[in-house]
Design a protein with these regions (language model features):
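Membrane-embedded architecture of ER/inner-membrane glycosylation machinery
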Residues: 163, 281-575
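Membrane-integral, polyisoprenol-dependent glycosyltransferases
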Residues: 1-371, 552, 561-568
């Protein structure tokens, strides 16, 4: 096996070990993941792979490709679970990492490709999306691969029709909507214009690719319309055009423009900290290159912009393409009112390349900044381990959590970390950050090169991610998951429908096997009902004339769906 193949398989193995083993460790603790998982569950139960109903009357918010993937994996595994719901996202991320690694290695060399891949793998936002059972990572992988394939198609003289790129765009649109096709066509179209391919030729190619890639989506739309009718059409319009235009019937992640900048800074932690810190170490000549030289300062703004634009268009084709991918997608998501950090994930691979180029230059210069960061993250690994042992020994009092609204929940987290039983394998994971810290301190003691410290910090981040996914997150979220509510309801009524009022309890419904129904939409004669406390008075006012309501239990913690305490009632029709 040659060196290139060995490096490829090492990266593949590292990605698998970091992302896959702990997918099933954490219970669902938010609305999003069980909402996706229950759609796949109802697909398998009903046999309806186009537009299955869940919660009795509800249809899925998005196209079905992710649900198909979850259902296929779950069928092979024997049922839908936390692991099978999250597995497609991890496979998509690993595939994207390996494809982008090969794409960069072929054009810029193996060292830069390895560093780019490590930066992506250690990005907080990428990691979070890769281990979550949500739509975002699957669509992002298709978008990034389609972009790379379209660049390769243009690079090779546009001799062959890029069917694989079109297939990726089609899968992207079937995952989360038209942006799976819009982004690759938009970026590639602008790139071809700047490369002087001609407007009509560029527009014609992109229109053709875009049209072919949305055909499967239109076919699914038609088949789903036959089942869902106007309700389906209204939902799809609201989730796509309504979300972009800010005309949705409910508030959906509405944020100002500066939110996108903050999420990028946070999503690239700690590499953004390293980048900012490095700016203070630049020599005067290097700092001038980042701003403007003396001759540029004497020119007018029009001349400066014209010269900057000329340099921008004449840079290396791959650099230009990556810059266009970052800038166009970022600007696109600054337009709608709805903004989320995961929307910007398609630009992360291309940003990783720019970070890798910058950090490699710093390392070649022998910057001591990497050694300082080794000390910082080594200390962080030691402090995390010491804090955990202090909690296990009962040295951290409950009073440290204060008396605020979330104090009881935080105390529950503390008790879970203190009292949960861990076997030998878990203790190895607990000690992993400490091992990483010792390796970093050894690098410092040996006066290792800046490049060694750079890779050491990346390795330390991976140790922290593994410890977090394998130990800390599963232990903590077990206290806030609504699986406990579902289990109490199962104990009260092992079979048949159960009911909720007002809010959607996606987690409870998932753990009940899609047994929840909206009591407002049905007329049961008796049963059990759950309601968040903030809607309890409204529920009593609406239902008390029809039903006799008897309280059964109330949670002592906040539901992860309702973000409030929940009360269960037994109800029966008044005589």
């Amino acid at each position: 096996m040659n060196n290139q193949r060995r490096i490829f398989w090492l990266i593949a193995l590292l990605s698998i070990l970091v992302l896959v083993p702990f997918l099933g460790e954490s219970l669902f603790y938010s609305k999003g993941e069980p909402r996706e998982g229950i759609v796949a569950f109802t697909m398998l139960e009903s046999g309806n792979w186009i537009l299955p109903l869940n919660y009795g009357t509800d249809i899925a918010f998005k196209p079905p490709f992710l649900y198909w993937c979850i259902a296929a994996v779950s069928w092979l595994a024997g049922g839908v679970s936390e692991f099978t719901t999250r597995f497609p996202s991890s496979v998509a991320c690993i595939s994207m990492l390996l494809f982008f690694f090969c794409f960069i290695r072929k054009r810029l060399g193996q060292e830069l490709a390895v560093l780019t891949t490590l930066l992506l793998l250690t990005s907080f936002e990428v990691h979070r999306a890769a281990v979550a059972g949500r739509l975002d990572m699957l669509q992002v992988a298709f978008i990034v691969v389609a972009l790379c394939l379209l660049y390769q198609w243009d690079e090779q003289g546009r001799r062959h029709f890029p069917w694989l790129a079109i297939l990726c765009m089609a899968c992207g649109t079937l995952t989360k909507g038209p942006v799976g096709s819009i982004f690759p066509c938009m970026v590639m179209g602008v790139y071809m214009l700047l490369q002087k391919r001609g407007f009509w030729k560029s527009f014609g190619w992109m229109f053709c690719f875009g049209f072919l890639s949305v055909l499967p989506l239109f076919i699914w739309f038609y088949l789903a319309y036959l089942q869902g009718g106007q309700e389906f059409v209204d939902l799809m319009l609201e989730e796509n055009t309504g979300r972009f235009a800010g005309t949705m019937s409910y508030e959906s992640h509405e944020n100002p423009i500066w939110y996108n900048f903050l999420t990028l800074i946070w999503g690239w932690i700690p590499w953004t900290l390293l980048f900012v810190a490095s700016l203070f170490t630049l020599r005067n000549k290097e700092a001038q290159q980042l701003t403007m030289n003396e001759s540029q300062a004497t020119k007018g703004w029009a001349s400066r912009v014209q010269e900057w634009w000329k340099r921008f268009c004449q840079q290396d084709p791959l650099q230009l393409f990556c810059w266009l991918a970052v800038l166009l997608i970022f600007v696109f998501y600054c337009i709608p009112k709805s903004k989320r950090s995961v929307y910007l994930l398609p630009i992360y691979p291309f940003m990783a390349l720019f970070f890798a180029q910058y950090l490699r230059r710093l390392a070649e210069r022998g910057s001591r900044l990497f050694r300082n960061f080794s000390i910082v993250f080594g200390s962080l690994g030691v402090l995390l381990t010491l804090l955990f042992f202090a909690i296990r020994l009962g040295l951290v009092p409950d009073a440290i959590m204060g008396h605020g609204r979330h104090a009881a929940e935080n105390v529950g987290f503390l008790h879970a970390l203190r009292d949960t039983y861990f076997d030998f394998a878990h203790w190895l994971l607990i000690l992993l950050p400490l091992v990483g810290a010792l390796c970093l301190f050894r690098l410092c003691r040996r006066q290792a090169s800046a490049r060694a410290h750079l890779y050491g910090v990346a390795g330390m981040l991976l140790c922290l991610f593994v410890a977090f996914d394998g130990i800390y997150q599963p232990t903590v979220v077990s206290t806030k998951s609504d699986k406990k509510i579902a289990q109490r309801l199962i104990d009260l009524q092992p079979e048949g429908h159960l009911y909720s009022y007002g809010l959607y309890f996606y987690s409870v419904n998932y753990y009940l096997g899609d047994r929840l129904r909206h009591i407002e939409r049905e007329t049961p004669t008796k049963g059990y009902l759950i309601v968040p406390l903030f809607e309890e008075e409204k529920m009593i006012a609406e239902l008390s004339e029809r039903y006799e309501l008897q309280p059964v239990f109330q949670t002592t913690y906040r539901s992860c769906d309702a973000r409030a305490q929940v009360r269960c009632y037994y109800f029966y029709t008044r005589p």
